[in-house]
Amino acid sequence: MCRRTSVLPLVLSLFHLYYYGNVLSVSIPLSINITDRILPVQLNTTILMEGAEELNITQQLNVKHFQEGQLTREENFVCSHMTTTDLATDFFQLSKLAGAYDAAGSQDQRLHSPSLTSTLAPVVPETTPATLTPDGVTLNIRTSVTDINPLTRFTKAVRDLKEDITPGYDLTNGRKFGREFLRALEENGVRGRHKRDSTTDVLQMTLDVTESREKYVEIRDQCASVLGALIKSMVPSVSEHCLYHYHIKNIINCFTSHYIRLHNEPDFPLVMALYSEYLSLTVKIHYMDEILVSTLRA
């Protein structure tokens, strides 16, 4: 006895494969929520940043390397020289947006998150599109070459942090936040020194720390606690996960910047170890909780 089977699911499946397999380019503003779509992206996707020509380096990051926490030396260099806005953007966020967040390696098990309301500002300007292609995705991230200077970029992060995470924040108040952060650190026993850079008119800050990893961990924890409480008091709606994510990155960056200042060139084993620790933390945060998609406005 033969059982009649509907061919409609098969036809729909073939149409789905044909359609998504033949889309040459799809432009999607980063300000909308596309977590309900499945987009074909390979794990060897690279993320390109503007300004590579001026820096004379190939600014590419392999999504798989980043997800696994195994950055090459060049990728680590790129990662450590991004602007604060790009740090806030986060490569996990972009790879999720592109559909390259299949942790199990199977399209059937790809994450499928509901739309969430954002409590944060758009991660990048609405005019910046993500261009998706069948063999990968190229994400055009707007960067400022002057901000990528390792001697100025990290200390600028503290001033910019409040501006990045608060919708409609008055940009003229950025330095006030930086001063409050420095004062809070000093009140908690973390010594700091700051001066104004005459060429960029940016408030510079370094933390007086030793080269020992134990001292770094102590300083990092103090800074994270102080900065977290300060941001939480100013932005009560900010997510605990995003808050943790932001301040850990900025504390690591401040330490890395200080180390580069002392030695003129980074000690790559130590710097990589710190970034490895950071990557491990962010992997746990982003794959244990769906708060990431809340940064995309519905």
From Swiss-Prot:
Keywords: Signal. Residues 1-25 form the signal peptide. Does not belong to rhabdoviridae replication core genes, and is specific to sigma virus: PP3 is presumably involved in host-virus interactions. Belongs to the sigma rhabdovirus PP3 family. This is Protein PP3.
